[in-house]
A protein has these predicted regions:
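Glycine-rich flexible loops
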Residues: 1-222
Length: 222
C-alpha cells in the first residue's frame, strides 16, 4: 500500500461512507469504517454517526491498542476492529455495515458457518474468497473479539449473525469493493434460493485460484 497522508485518509473515509449511505447499504447511524495510519494507530468513525454525514475533523483517532487519542467518541465496535487488525496482518482498512441482503443471509438456518455463500460468481471469489458466519453477539460486546480472532486470519470477510457483514482489505477502496460484492452476492443467493441454481464447479473454482490467485481457507489465507 502506498503511504497516504492522514488528511487524505480522513477524506476517503467520509467519501466512501457517503457513497455507501446514499446507495442504501447502511441505514441511519449504522455501520462503521476504520483505516490504519502509516505512523501507527488508526482512524475510525464515531459512535452514533451516520456514514452519510461524516466530518473528517471529527473522526476518532486511536492508538495501536484501540484507545482513543482525539476526535469524537469512537464506535462501540472498536473491539471488533481491533480483533481484525490484531489477527490479520494484511488488513489496513475495515468496513462494517448493516446492509439488508447480507443481514438477511446471516439469519438463514441453512448457512454454513465456514462458507456463508456458495461459489456463485467469479468476482465474489476474487473479491471475498469465502465468508464465515460468526454467532450472534450484541453490538459492542467485547466477546465478539475472541470469535473474530479465531477467523480473521483465514477470512477477509465475515457475517455477524443477525447483525451485518465485516470486510477487511489492504486498502479502504479494496474493503469497500469487497463489501459491495458480498452484498450483491447475498442478494443473488436470496433471489435464487430454492431454485436449484448452477454454482461454479470445483474445477472452475480451482481455475480462479490458479489464474487470479484467489485464496480460500482450504488453500491458505482468504
Amino acid at each position: 500500500m502506498t503511504a497516504m497522508s492522514e488528511t487524505r485518509l480522513r477524506e476517503d473515509i467520509c467519501r466512501f461512507g457517503r457513497s455507501l449511505f446514499e446507495r442504501g447499504l447502511t441505514p441511519g447511524s449504522s455501520g462503521n469504517i476504520s483505516v490504519k495510519l502509516e505512523g501507527g494507530g488508526w482512524l475510525v468513525t464515531p459512535t452514533n454517526a451516520s456514514l452519510g454525514f461524516l466530518d473528517p475533523a471529527k473522526l476518532s483517532r486511536l492508538d495501536n491498542q484501540g484507545r482513543p487519542i482525539s476526535g469524537d467518541a469512537p464506535t462501540k465496535e472498536v473491539p471488533l476492529h481491533s480483533a481484525v487488525y490484531d489477527t490479520r496482518g494484511s488488513a489496513r482498512a475495515i468496513v462494517h455495515l448493516h446492509s439488508t441482503h447480507s443481514v438477511a443471509l446471516s439469519m438463514l438456518p441453512e448457512i454454513d458457518p465456514h462458507a456463508a455463500l456458495p461459489p456463485m460468481t467469479a468476482y465474489y471469489l476474487m473479491k471475498c474468497g469465502a465468508t464465515a458466519l460468526v454467532p450472534y453477539y450484541r453490538p459492542g460486546d467485547p466477546a465478539v473479539a475472541d470469535a473474530i480472532k479465531g477467523l480473521a486470519g483465514k477470512y477477509s470477510s465475515v457475517l455477524l449473525a443477525n447483525h451485518g457483514p465485516v470486510v477487511a482489505g489492504n486498502t479502504l477502496e479494496a474493503a469497500v469493493f469487497a463489501m459491495e460484492e458480498l452484498e450483491e452476492t447475498a442478494k443473488l443467493y436470496l433471489l435464487l434460493r430454492g431454485l436449484n441454481p448452477r454454482y461454479l464447479s470445483p474445477e472452475q473454482v480451482a481455475d480462479l485460484v490458479k489464474v487470479f490467485g484467489v485464496t480460500l481457507p482450504e488453500h491458505g489465507q482468504a
